[in-house]
């Protein structure tokens, strides 16, 4: 009964205000660090990005909450808190002993997994780093301690990882099919690629904004950049804007893919691609 009351309270005081663009009132615990600290303000989308994305005020508010409402303790934004929740659910860690991702990351259940974090997952990174065999990389890294990995040409071996994590990266990759094929290749049978990309679920279809022709970028629409609008570095350029048909673009022949949307904010979506050949599949039928 207490769980039901908490859930109804959370929906009324947190999820409903988010959907309506109102302040949140409920002091909820953070799925990343477990802290009950209050949330910060929504992030503010640049006017140029709002215009290039062609989103209405409702979707603007939801995306601003996706990228904001920072935890006062660990600094995680809404996107990473929901990613943490989905990772725990997918890896079979809803045990009451794992109240947060920080708890789970300290467990033997997590430490025995082979994990690749391709580009940092925000506040999740310091907990992922508790895994002694974490393969962490940043595209274009100049830090000798942090390797650079190109998602279309990963250096890892076949069937190496139980879990691959990417967050808001694939929309910036010119060769999406190549990147997804590489991720599928390095996953073990039954392994999971759990990831986020911005997707607008308002009836629009996925739009390709740019293509790569040899070494030359051809813009099909005016260039659009995520993050700080004024920072027009090449790795922030948007090649794909995902819409209602996002799963069709993110599916590969060897994976089963689905999406989980935050119940109070559909702008917060987490995708789960499971490589075929896992133990559950082998035992089916």
Language-model-detected regions and their locations in the chain:
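GHKL-family ATP-binding catalytic core of two-component histidine kinases
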Residues: 155-157, 174, 243
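A short SAM/SAH-binding and catalytic strip from SAM-dependent methyltransferases
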Residues: 162-174
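S-adenosyl-L-methionine-dependent methyltransferase catalytic module, highlighting the catalytic core
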Residues: 3, 14-28, 32-35, 177-284
């Amino acid at each position: 009964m207490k769980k039901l009351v908490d859930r109804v309270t959370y929906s009324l005081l947190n999820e409903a205000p988010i959907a309506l663009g109102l302040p949140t009132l409920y002091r909820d615990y953070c799925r990343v660090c477990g802290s009950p600290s209050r949330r910060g303000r929504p992030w503010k989308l640049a006017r140029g990005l709002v215009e290039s994305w062609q989103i209405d005020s409702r979707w603007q508010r939801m995306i601003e909450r996706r990228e904001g409402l920072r935890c006062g303790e660990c600094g995680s934004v809404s996107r990473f808190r929901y990613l943490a929740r989905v990772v725990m659910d997918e890896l079979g860690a809803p045990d009451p002993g794992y109240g947060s991702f920080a708890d789970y990351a300290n467990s033997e259940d997590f430490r025995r997994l082979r994990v690749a974090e391709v580009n940092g997952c925000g506040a999740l990174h310091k907990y992922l780093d508790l895994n002694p065999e974490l393969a962490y990389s940043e595209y274009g890294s100049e830090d000798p301690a942090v390797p650079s990995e190109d998602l279309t040409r990963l250096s890892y071996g076949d069937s190496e990882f139980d879990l691959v994590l990417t967050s808001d990266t694939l929309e910036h990759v010119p060769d999406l099919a190549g990147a997804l094929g590489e991720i599928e290749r390095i996953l073990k049978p039954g392994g999971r690629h759990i990831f986020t990309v911005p997707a607008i679920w308002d009836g629009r279809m996925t739009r390709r904004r740019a293509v790569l022709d040899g070494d030359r970028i051809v813009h099909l629409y005016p260039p659009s950049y995520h993050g700080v609008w004024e920072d027009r570095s090449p790795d922030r350029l948007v090649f794909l804007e995902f819409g209602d048909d996002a799963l069709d673009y993110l599916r590969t022949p060897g994976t089963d893919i689905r999406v989980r949307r935050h119940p109070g904010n559909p702008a917060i979506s987490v995708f789960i691609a499971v490589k075929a050949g896992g133990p559950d599949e082998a035992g089916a039928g």
